[in-house]
Structure formats: C-alpha cells, structure tokens
A protein has these predicted regions:
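Gly/Ser/Thr/Pro-rich low-complexity, intrinsically disordered segments
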Residues: 13-291
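Bacterial N-terminal signal peptides
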Residues: 3-14
Length: 291
C-alpha cells in the first residue's frame, strides 16, 4: 500500500490549474454518467499528486473517442500535426480527456529531430491510433495497445483479426492478470496510465504529476503499477508520459479544465504541450445528437 491523503473532489475545480474552454448550455452530472474524479496526495517515498478518473463503461452512458490533430500530408509519413489538447477536446459532448500514444518528430537531412514541440509540427504516432473503426496509425500485433470493442469494453493488446473501434497505444503493460509485470526501481517521471477491471467494464485513467520538487516528483514503473493495482486494475498499461501527461475534466459550470499540473514550463508558468491525439470520454447521448 502507498500512504496517501485522499481528496474526493465534488468537481468544484476552480482552484486547480487549467484554461477555460467552451461550455455546454447545461453542465453534465458526471457522477450520474458514471465518472468519478479523485485526487490522491502521496507523501512517501516522494511527494506526488495522483489524478484518477474511474469510469463505468457498462451502462453505455459515456463512450470513448480518440481525437487526432489534422493530418498534414495525406498519404505521407506524418500522421498528425501537434495540436493543443484542449482544442481537440473542445466539443460540448466531451466530459474528460487524457494523453495516450508515444510519438516523435521526423529527422532533418542531417538526421536531427526537432523536439522543441510546437503547434502544427508534423509527427509520427507510435502504435494503434484511431476512432470509429478507422485507424490513422496502425501497428503490428502487440500487448501495448489499449482499445475498445463494439460493445464498449476496453481491451489490452491486439492480435490479427481484432477489430478495434477506438484505439490507442502505450509503452508497456505494467499490470497483467492482477499482478505487477515490472520490477522495482527506475527513474521517476510524470506518468499517464490506463487500466481496467477483469471484464473491461470499468476504466481507470490516471495521471501522476512529476518533475516538480516538493510538490509532485513523479513515479517509476513499479510505483505506477502499484497504484493501478491498488485501484482494482486487472490490467494496466503505461502510456506516454513526461511533459505530455495531461488530464482534462468538465467542471460543474460546464467548463473544460486541465486538472493536473503538466511539467513543461515557459517563463515559470505551466505550458500545455501540443499533442497529436487525445483519448476523450464523451456523453453518449450528447455525442449522438451532434452527429
């Protein structure tokens, strides 16, 4: 067990860091839709702030959807242009979002990659990425994919013949069959993880803030896996982390806000890193009305 002080927020997130976005006419009741947000503060072995979304998929009141940045070159090598994640999650039906897949820039003529990320930058997405059954980025069969089937269940790892409806990809599986699959030790970073119960009907989205000494210093793989198992995850995967780790949630007033503290900074202020894609959780009824 990891010692922590648990703060179960009632989604009055005015004091948390974020940037307001467009609001629906009526703020959604997230708990009624099966979404619960918890912030856990851990003091040992280092200070950490752990943002947890528990989502009930079975009632089908909400649905996952991947939103990708624009494709800059059609059939060319780039699969998306980096975009502010809040922009990708700006539809009124979106209730929450997190970052998912690893990605990288393309080398120039001298083999150098520009990792000074900026909006509009063309990038290559690693692994499966798509929504509505259409994959923008494909990948070989792997246990690092996290996808949703046509019954709305979350699945981990894909094989030839699988038909993902919504798909993302991580770095490595950290919990399998209820047991940790990673050893102790390692470097601490900001982290994003996705996990589920044995039946794939309860989804956990987790972001751990990091690289902020004395406030939230991040986790290694073993610490992250321990968190996911303690939540009740039968399976969990480590997604892209570092400065990309971000979680957004719609507040009681209907405003979409970033609830975590991303590690990137510009002139001492939080800088939200542009991303190629996000996994959103949408109000299923609202989404159907908008289509």
């Amino acid at each position: 067990m990891w010692p922590c002080l648990t703060i179960c927020l009632t989604l009055s997130l005015d004091c948390l860091r974020g940037t307001p976005e467009g609001s629906p006419e009526t703020a959604p009741d997230l708990k009624e839709l099966g979404i619960n947000y918890t912030l856990k503060k851990s003091a040992s072995p280092v200070p950490n702030r752990i943002h947890i979304l528990r989502i009930e998929l079975a009632p089908r009141k909400v649905e996952p959807a991947v939103v990708l940045g624009p494709d800059p070159d059609g059939d060319g090598p780039a699969e998306a242009s980096l975009t502010d994640p809040r922009e990708m999650a700006s539809a009124p039906s979106v209730l929450a979002f997190i970052n998912t897949n690893p990605w990288d820039s393309f080398p120039d003529a001298k083999g150098r990659k520009n990792r000074r990320w900026h909006s509009g930058q063309p990038v290559d997405i690693h692994g499966l990425a798509g929504t509505g059954g259409k994959m923008r980025s494909s990948g070989n069969p792997s246990n690092t994919s996290v996808w949703f089937d046509n019954e709305g269940r979350v699945r981990f790892g894909h094989q030839a013949g699988d038909e993902p409806v919504v798909a993302t990809n991580g770095f490595q599986m950290i919990v399998s069959n209820g047991a940790l699959t990673v050893g102790e030790g390692g470097v601490r970073h900001p982290r994003t993880a996705i996990g589920s119960d044995k039946k794939g009907k309860i989804l956990w989205l987790v972001v751990v803030d990091g690289r902020q000494g004395g406030y939230s210093e991040g986790m290694n793989m073993h610490e992250l896996a321990s968190v996911m198992k303690s939540l009740g995850c039968w399976t969990a995967t480590n997604m892209d982390g570092g400065g990309s780790s971000v979680m957004g949630l719609r507040d009681q007033d209907g405003t979409m806000k970033v609830v975590n503290s991303p590690s990137d900074r510009f002139l001492g202020r939080v800088k939200i890193r542009p991303l190629p894609m996000v996994l959103t959780i949408r109000d299923a009824t609202d989404a159907q009305e908008q289509e």
